[in-house]
């Protein structure tokens, strides 16, 4: 169904708004994906904080023109799917990577992160990025490690002193 000018403007505004909030963008070719497969992928996308949209490339180019994702304009050829990570940068990468394992028709075309254009192979790198909770857990572990090591060292010194006192006490009673 063809969109009228007002509907096209709404699509451009919506996509531009999402792009300004997004952490990363993956553009993928979806030709050959069935409607039920696409519906399943959209459901997974909603659950993982990924905005998934199929729009005409001219509208996408117009929407992304004033954002950090303007670098992908030259790659917008053919039927494409746009996956924006809204919560953490790796969410779209994990979604596309996981879904393309099951459905070989879905092929990532390009990745954009921080205004830099990367080839399709970087989807794996993006997918391996930790989630926000995982990153916070790693940070907490790194921050608590020196304190834990210090506490263990003090306990070891205290244990050595108590063993020394226990060993020297029987020697004193024999003398």
UniProtKB/Swiss-Prot annotation:
Residue ranges of coiled coil: none
Provide this UniProt record's keywords sorted from A to Z. Answer: Ribonucleoprotein, Ribosomal protein, RNA-binding, rRNA-binding
The protein's matches in Pfam families, at most eight in alphabetical order, are given as: Ribosomal_L10
GO CC terms of this entry: large ribosomal subunit
**SUPFAM superfamilies according to UniProt:** Ribosomal protein L10-like (SSF160369)
Q: What is a GO molecular function of this protein?
A: large ribosomal subunit rRNA binding
Gene Ontology annotations of biological process type: translation
Stated role: Forms part of the ribosomal stalk, playing a central role in the interaction of the ribosome with GTP-bound translation factors.
Question: Known PANTHER family for this protein?
Answer: 39S RIBOSOMAL PROTEIN L10, MITOCHONDRIAL (PTHR11560)
Q: Which family is it part of?
A: Belongs to the universal ribosomal protein uL10 family.
**Could you describe the subunit structure of this protein?**
Part of the ribosomal stalk of the 50S ribosomal subunit. The N-terminus interacts with L11 and the large rRNA to form the base of the stalk. The C-terminus forms an elongated spine to which L12 dimers bind in a sequential fashion forming a multimeric L10(L12)X complex.
The name of this protein is Large ribosomal subunit protein uL10
The organism named in the record is: Xylella fastidiosa (strain 9a5c)
Give the gene that encodes this protein.
rplJ
